[in-house]
Every structure is written in C-alpha cells, then in structure tokens.
Amino acid sequence: FQSSLKAQSFYDIGTIQEIKIVFSQSNWDYMLDTAKSGGEGYVMAQTVAINGTIFDSVGVKYKGNSTYNANQSKNPWHIELDTYKTQDYQGFKDIKLSNVAKDPSFLREVLSYEVARKYMVAPKSNYAVVFVNGTQIGLYSNSEAISKTFVKQHLFSNKETFIKCNPPAGAGPGTSDYPNLVYEGTDSADYYAGYELKSDHGWHDLIAFTDTLKNHITAIEELLNVDQTLWMHAFNNGLVNLDSYSGGFAQNY
C-alpha cells in the first residue's frame, strides 16, 4: 500500500494519502488547543510519516476558524515539515488538511478545486487519512497550500510581492479590518490590520493596486488579469464559495 502511494503524486486524485503523526507529549491535544488560542504557534511532533516516509521534528498546529472547535476530536491541521529543519515531501513543505466540516458528502472542497482548475490556477486536492499516536482521527481533504512553492510553480517566481489577504487578528462579526482592496491612502500602516505581508517588500505595490482600482480603473489591466478575475468571481458565486473575496469578510485569497 505505502510503496504504491510513494509512486503517486501527493495530490493525485485517485489515491488516499496516509499521514501518521506521533507526539511525545501525552497532552498533545491540549497543547494544540492552547497554541491555537494564543496565536497559532506550532507544536513539535516527534515524527510525521507520510505514506511511510518518516520526518522527525515537525511543526504541527490546528487551523481554521468556524471549522475548529476545542471540544471536537477531528480538527483541521496545518503540518509544516520545515519548521525546525530543512525537509520536504515531493517538494511540498506545507500540508493543509481540512476536516470536511458541515459537508456530509465529503466532496465539496475536492470537487470544487477540480472545477476551478479548468478555468484558472488553483490548488490540487485529494484526501488523506490521519492517525495520531496510532489512533485513526478520520478522513480529511488534502489541498495544496498557496505557498511560495505554489507561486513559483505557476507564476515562475517567488521573489515578487506576496500578500496573504487575511486579517492577522482574524475576521468575523464585530471586526471591520477586511482585505477588501479598498484604497486606504498612501500610508502603509493603514493596511496592516487587513493584510499579512509574506514577502520582504510589497506594501507599496498593494497601495498602488488599490489606488488604480479606485482612481485609475482604465489602467487596471496593467496590474490585474481581468479575465482570470472574472472566472474567479463566477466560480465563487456559482459554487457559493463565500469564505473568499466574494464573501462578507472578503478574505482567504
């Protein structure tokens, strides 16, 4: 089983990946919950085995907002293979596992990405079964992370401006700092609450883009692939992908 999986791509739609996490700490769930409530720091797993390939000293944390709950046993995961040492699996360092919350069909995320990739650049996605300290936690959707590796593969460079459009403090009812591409003026500090800069530079580019979008719309095609953007809006609306730029919090892109 494991040898056949190793021969396949990690995101091959026809295979279910096997991920086995081992913590040396018996209170690993409490530690992950504590890390999540305190700013989403990583907890070190003793080992993580992916289809039989074993990695030691791996960063692991719970992810998600509405899909995470400290009182449930099946929470979404973010596994970062290179938190503490340089290592990867088939070139992938970040592994994002969703717990398929509120989707009894188990199809929504994986099928949606299958549709999206026909019209635009989008992550690959399949399934993985997860074990922790020998106990099976369940079946997860396994979707490719939008990382610098992903950007380099599809845009042929990871040295340019790279911005995660999620408020660092989180978005939700009662908050108003949304990454909605509204022009907030020329002071980069006015954008810090709504966006997370993942590259060494880029605030000036974000400001220039939002300024163009508001004040110089006839020049927008110099900065934005309008055709791909329209496909993105069609996808978000057609498949009711509201946890996106098209949703109320205008995030997760």
Predicted regions and their residues:
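Regulatory N- and C-terminal appendages and interdomain linkers associated
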Residues: 4-57
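TRNA-binding/sensing appendages of the translation machinery
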Residues: 8-12, 20, 98, 104-114
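Extracellular/periplasmic catalytic domains that process cell-envelope and extracellular macromolecules
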Residues: 12-15, 40, 52-54, 69-73, ...
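A short, sequence-level motif marking secondary-structure junctions
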Residues: 25-26, 59-68, 142-148
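Conserved oxyanion/phosphate-binding beta-strand-loop segments in alpha/beta enzyme cores
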Residues: 44-99, 198
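Zn2+-dependent metallopeptidase catalytic core
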Residues: 45-51, 55, 107-121
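Internal "kinase-insert"/substrate-recognition segments embedded within catalytic cores
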Residues: 78-86, 99-100, 118-127, 132-239
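Catalytic activation segment of kinase domains across protein kinase-like and atypical kinase folds
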Residues: 244-253
